[in-house]
């Protein structure tokens, strides 16, 4: 059985599976709705400023390039290391898991193929764990 018959992660296949920029934008909008709504995310929501527009835009732009689409983040802001960009935050297991829960709920709300939903969440676990590892408080 081939686990990735849709070739996610190859060229722009993940970007297309996510619905390109419009689909990524919907995902990120829903992600922050989840962060504002679920009790498990209160702590990580407080890490963000009151105005979510700047971080929303950055996440949309980052995911565009990360998923194989246009590299909007680097065009607008330059290069990025996700772990180093989040190093100042205290991200332990609880915060990592809350972030992943928000993303899982947002992904589940998207019209993606089930195989892409599983793939995307598995891929997002990698940078989430790296952020925890370099955090000011990785416990």
Where do the protein language model's features map onto the residues?
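Core of compact, soluble alpha-helical bundle domains
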Residues: 1-139
């Amino acid at each position: 059985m081939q686990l990735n018959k849709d070739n996610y992660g190859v060229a722009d296949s993940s970007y297309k599976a996510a619905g390109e920029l419009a689909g990524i934008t919907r995902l990120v909008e829903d992600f922050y709705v989840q962060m504002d709504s679920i009790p498990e995310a209160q702590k990580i929501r407080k890490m963000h400023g009151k105005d979510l527009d700047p971080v929303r835009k950055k996440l949309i732009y980052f995911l565009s390039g990360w998923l194989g689409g246009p590299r909007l983040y680097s065009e607008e802001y330059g290069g990025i290391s996700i772990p180093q960009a989040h190093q100042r935050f205290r991200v332990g297991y609880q915060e990592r898991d809350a972030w992943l829960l928000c993303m899982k709920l947002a992904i589940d709300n998207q019209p993606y193929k089930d195989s892409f939903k599983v793939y995307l969440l598995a891929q997002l676990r990698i940078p989430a764990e790296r952020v925890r590892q370099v955090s000011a408080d990785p416990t």
